[in-house]
Amino acid sequence: MARHGGAYVIAAVGSASRGDGLAALGADEVVVGLKGVGGPVDVVLDTVGGAHLVAAWGLLAPGGVLHSIGWASGEPAVFPVNSTFAPGASRTLRSFGDTTAPAADLALLVDLVAQGALRAPIGWRGSWRHLGGAIEALRERRVPGKVLLDLDRL
């Protein structure tokens, strides 16, 4: 979606194999870890949390925004003293918690998928009755892509 909106997209992954297919999805660069990101960057979407979130903060340009949208590491984010202060326009950290009605956003996503401008590869599909297995696969990082749960009858 960022690429669709005109952004230059850098996808940072935990291992080279996790980057397979990301260029085809719109990433201009795929790097392993944040050390490969030259910075500064305007926007970061972080799903890892912990030390990764702190490192991502350090990549922000003045006026940049870091969106914390997950906490896969399960570790605390500990910022060094004074690391959140810098000259220039303020940098911002936001957490995922928007509770506004998603209808308009979902309609946009459906439209982009219908146009072929947005793809969401499915890495695991199964009955909602196997939710535990799906969650385990996600936590163990065995799913490249999205999990799709089919709702069947009891």
Show where each model-derived region lies.
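Glycine-rich phosphate-binding loop and adjacent beta-alpha segment
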Residues: 51-118, 151-154
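C-terminal capping/lid region of NAD(P)-dependent oxidoreductase domains
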Residues: 117-121, 133-154
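Short acidic-hydrophobic, aromatic-tinged amphipathic segments that line or gate anion-handling sites
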Residues: 29-33, 125-130
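A short acidic, Gly/Pro-enriched loop at the edge of an enzyme's catalytic core
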Residues: 37-44
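Short, well-ordered alpha-helical microsegments
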Residues: 19, 53-54, 132
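N-terminal Rossmann-like NAD(P) cofactor-binding module of classical short-chain dehydrogenase/reductase
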Residues: 44-45, 67
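N-terminal Rossmann-fold cofactor-binding loop
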Residues: 12-17, 33-34, 47, 70, ...
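Mid-domain Rossmann-like dinucleotide-binding core that forms the NAD(H)/NADP(H) cofactor-binding site
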Residues: 1-33
